[in-house]
């Protein structure tokens, strides 16, 4: 049985600023604890990046102080997408990469993500070591052994060149008009340059971060602005990233959303690589599974969370996986979810096939799916609640085997997510309504 973790969630540590570990004094100690673990493993250099939220500067300073107190050298990247930190950690031969971000969450949240020297999410074992070190009293190394900090000035340029190198189109993007929504986040100074330098005409929105507006009515979790702009600009398609750049969603020329499931379908069926199977999650649409099956491609489902998709891919020796929400893994190109790189793979397929995004998505028909989030006081007992178990069973029986229900707790927010999928929208609307009411009764 796995040992429970005290601080780490499904994607690092995350909370509202000023709550839990997301306070300057505690982040300083977290930096020290992580530094202590790094030193215990005989290593001594970390790289720190962040998204654009206002609290990032405060936590960057706190982490820097903690690592230096532990005798670990620090390289500061400034605002940089999460996947860029993973990539640069490898190319600079750092021993770990740290990202200060709450991903798609609002500005009042923040968090810490951790990468190994190989640019991969750290293991459960290392997370347990960090938690154990955090419980110890902080002690500072001698003055002569303190770590040193420096800023890396050419990081953005290095990452832009890497992204461009993953593009496999037979020709440049001259003639394409693309709208990019950078979510007022970490891709704001990266993504437009990548696509412009590949030859596209770029209309960029969400590129004026002020520390507060990250993910606010924009980006991969709120596509309305992008959809309207793609249609108004008569663009070929649009691409949206989330606040830290590890998610991607797309919009076709008609303004219709192309989500993570459809992106995975396009990648799996459009690549020249031999694809035996791909990894999705419990949330992946039944339409994806059916469409892939017709192509002889297996879909393996995991728990929700890109780390679980990654684990499945490593276990199977496969390279493609995705969550519906837009975490897309292309392990033939990167070590972690990378919104810019994933989008470039789709664009490569468009260019090489001569097909539009609308045409590429047509091989997959999505089942109607409704996902509703319920903010709750506590998620305790969700998996053992008898009333909820019976309600789920009754709901699936009413749908006659042509639908499914998934109720799960968010790993990063005080939410219970209710998802119902089936071949009739009116039916699933009715089922969602009754299940949400029950969740509110039992947990609010």
Curated annotation (Swiss-Prot):
EC category name: isomerase
Pfam families cross-referenced by the UniProt entry: PGM_PMM_I (PF02878), PGM_PMM_II (PF02879), PGM_PMM_III (PF02880), PGM_PMM_IV (PF00408)
CDD domains reported in the protein's UniProt record: GlmM (cd05802)
Cofactor, free-text remark: Binds 1 Mg(2+) ion per subunit.
Entry-linked SUPFAM superfamilies: Phosphoglucomutase, C-terminal domain, Phosphoglucomutase, first 3 domains
Binding site residues for Mg(2+): 103, 242, 244, 246
GO biological process annotation, one example: peptidoglycan biosynthetic process
Entry keyword set: Isomerase, Magnesium, Metal-binding, Phosphoprotein
Modification(s) after translation: Activated by phosphorylation.
Listed GO MF terms: magnesium ion binding; phosphoglucosamine mutase activity; phosphomannomutase activity
InterPro entries listed in its UniProt record: A-D-PHexomutase_a/b/a-I (IPR005844), A-D-PHexomutase_a/b/a-I/II/III (IPR016055), A-D-PHexomutase_a/b/a-II (IPR005845), A-D-PHexomutase_a/b/a-III (IPR005846), A-D-PHexomutase_C (IPR005843), A-D-PHexomutase_C_sf (IPR036900), A-D-PHexomutase_CS (IPR016066), Alpha-D-phosphohexomutase_SF (IPR005841)
Active site, UniProt feature: 103 (phosphoserine intermediate)
Domain of life: Bacteria
Modified residues (Phosphoserine): 103
Biological role: Catalyzes the conversion of glucosamine-6-phosphate to glucosamine-1-phosphate.
NCBIfam families per UniProt: glmM, PRK10887.1
Protein family per UniProt: Belongs to the phosphohexose mutase family.
Protein name (record): Phosphoglucosamine mutase
